[in-house]
Curated annotation (Swiss-Prot):
The lineage of its organism: Eukaryota, Metazoa, Chordata, Craniata, Vertebrata. Interacts with CD81. A lipid is attached at residues 70-71, 104 (S-palmitoyl cysteine). This is Interferon-induced transmembrane protein 2. Disulfide bonds: none annotated. The gene is Ifitm2. The modification N-acetylmethionine is found at residue 1.
Amino acid sequence: MSHNSQAFLSTNAGLPPSYETIKEEYGVTELGEPSNSAVVRTTVINMPREVSVPDHVVWSLFNTLFFNACCLGFVAYAYSVKSRDRKMVGDVVGAQAYASTAKCLNISSLIFSILMVIICIIIFSTTSVVVFQSFAQRTPHSGF
């Protein structure tokens, strides 16, 4: 195996090359103002915008766990999961359709459940008043 050593000759031995040396070595020219004779071409790229489809999973889960009147919350949750699946596949139209159905079911469940709570409060308050009045009539008053 032969060892050939060649000396590296440079004017700036041991120093990094300056900007001027690099510019001359690679033939870099400075650019001036653009000439008006050049044709300017533009390229337009139409990027599809990201469509955010709300899937209402959290709302459906809330209705399923807390209200769930006539199982509407559970059905809304099923449609919400279908909407999320369609969104992951890339079917935006299908995701919007399932999300719309889930939203309608959630609204129906919420309204029905609120009405049921109001009716229960009314029934509880009227029965407690009636029971209180019946106890008041049975107990004799001790004359103070």
